[in-house]
Design a protein with these regions (language model features):
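Active-site residues of response regulator receiver
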Residues: 8, 54, 82
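Alpha4 helix (beta4-alpha4-beta5 surface) of REC/receiver domains from two-component response regulators
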Residues: 64, 84-101
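Conserved alpha-helical "signature site"
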Residues: 106-270, 274-370
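Conserved phosphotransfer cores of two-component systems
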Residues: 24-25, 44-46, 68-76, 96
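Two-component/phosphorelay signaling modules centered on CheY-like receiver
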Residues: 11-31
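Active-site beta3 strand of CheY-like receiver
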Residues: 46-52
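Receiver (REC) domain active-site loop signature in two-component systems and cognate sites
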Residues: 57
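Acidic catalytic/metal-coordinating carboxylates
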Residues: 34-38, 61-65
Length: 402
């Protein structure tokens, strides 16, 4: 049974939480504390899977509490309840917490958030990797895109369109801005999944402040991996995004689903980015195993990490509160038949796009030769559409003068 801690200096709020969550007592063991020090004392006695804390409290405030929880118990999911709408303050707090929730909050939204977090362990079983992922507060950007966006944002009159276009090419920037915009949109029914919409929602002034003052963007450190190119990884993500969106456009799917497919396609290998940036030595060992044993990179990851990049990426995105459609597309992009996707959507589009991009790419990535999940496609009645998609995608990538 999952264990959750709620912290608020208002006895009335805690009493309301008890009543609201009473029906969930068969799923979660819940504890309640009126101040940070009491919460930390309780956490010293037993571990907690999640902590939900008010932001503004006397003495040690919510951010300081969450920071200490992060230090003591990295894998504990951290959520702040707040009425703050200042994007910079939210961004700075998101260095410590994983998600924000509005205060006053909607009971259904809080229950849904806790349920989503409770289910993330299915994507990533290894506790050491969970600890590493849970401590992240940003993901690095491709160097050329990082310097391009910083130059544009530092200009006297930066262009919102140019900034949005740059963000839409980079998984690290996309994930961070989606995390912030979904936190800043306190209480809105929708969750943002499109990087361009995220930039538009925040506005150019806020993005400037976030990048230049709060430093939410970082640059990927130059590392030389044998058998792996970070440039190829970025190119593959960008192409997969375009292909995934095109597949849903061909099938006349809802425009919002097509945009979700684009975002999921760009982010589908974000677990590789996290592993390469934060665990470079074991990541290189996994790369070496693909050559030494002639195995796929997925199998090599499992041997070295006890996890693979799909699960790592899904765990991170879910922890940061990205929409479930994106999380599931990342989690199951190699084996969509393991999911419960009943219809053609972002998951299937990203799965097929990943395979087609590898087929059509001139620069192959060692150990990465994904295969189509034909059982999944047959279950959706789509096995006869593969040739149509492939023909259209080949045409899409042909130079204009051909």
């Amino acid at each position: 049974m999952k264990r959750v801690m709620f912290v608020d200096d208002s006895p009335n709020v805690l009493s309301g939480l008890r009543r609201m969550l009473h029906k969930m007592s068969n799923e979660w063991e819940m504890e309640f504390a009126e101040d940070a020090r009491t919460a930390l004392a309780m956490m010293a006695e037993k571990p907690f899977d999640a902590i939900v804390s008010d932001m503004r409290m006397p003495g040690m405030d919510g951010v300081a509490l969450i920071r200490e929880v992060k230090r003591r118990s990295p894998r504990t999911a951290r959520i702040i309840l707040s009425g703050v709408v200042d994007q910079k303050e939210i961004a700075e707090s998101l260095r410590e917490t994983h998600q924000f929730m509005p205060k006053p909050f909607r009971p259904k939204a809080l229950r849904a958030t806790l349920a989503r977090i409770s289910g993330l362990d299915a994507y990533l079983q290894d506790e050491k990797i969970r600890d590493t992922v849970a401590q992240l507060d940003t993901l690095p950007s491709f160097p050329s895109l990082y310097f391009e966006i910083m130059k544009e944002l530092d200009a006297p009159d930066p262009s919102l369109e140019k900034v949005a276009a740059i963000v839409a090419k980079d998984p690290g920037m996309t994930v961070k801005l989606l995390q912030i915009v979904n936190a800043a949109s306190l209480g809105l029914a929708r969750r943002f999944s499109n990087p361009v919409e995220a930039v538009q929602q925040l506005g150019i002034a806020a993005v400037q402040s976030l990048a230049l003052s709060a430093h939410v963007f970082t640059c990927f450190e130059s590392r030389a991996f044998k058998g792996f190119s970070i440039t190829k990884l970025w190119d593959h993500g960008a192409n997969t995004a375009r292909i995934a969106r095109k597949i849903l456009e061909i099938e006349r799917a809802d425009a919002a689903l097509a945009e979700d497919a684009y975002t999921a396609g760009m982010l589908h290998d974000i677990g590789k980015l996290m592993l390469a940036n934060n665990l470079p030595e074991p990541f290189q060992r996994a790369l070496d195993l693909t050559q030494e044993k002639g195995i796929r990179f997925l199998a090599a990851e499992e041997e070295v990490f006890g996890a693979n990049h799909a699960g790592v990426g899904a765990y991170l995105l879910g922890l940061w509160g990205l929409p479930t459609t994106i999380v599931e597309a990342v989690a199951f992009h190699h084996q969509p038949s393991r999911s419960e996707a009943p219809t053609l959507g972002p998951l299937t589009a990203v799965h097929v796009a990943n395979v087609l991009e590898h087929e059509l790419s001139e620069s192959k990535i060692i150990g990465c030769e994904p295969k189509l999940d034909l059982d999944h496609l047959a279950a959706l009645g789509l096995q006869d559409r593969i040739g149509v998609w492939r023909e259209q995608i080949v045409r899409m990538f042909q130079p204009d003068d051909e």
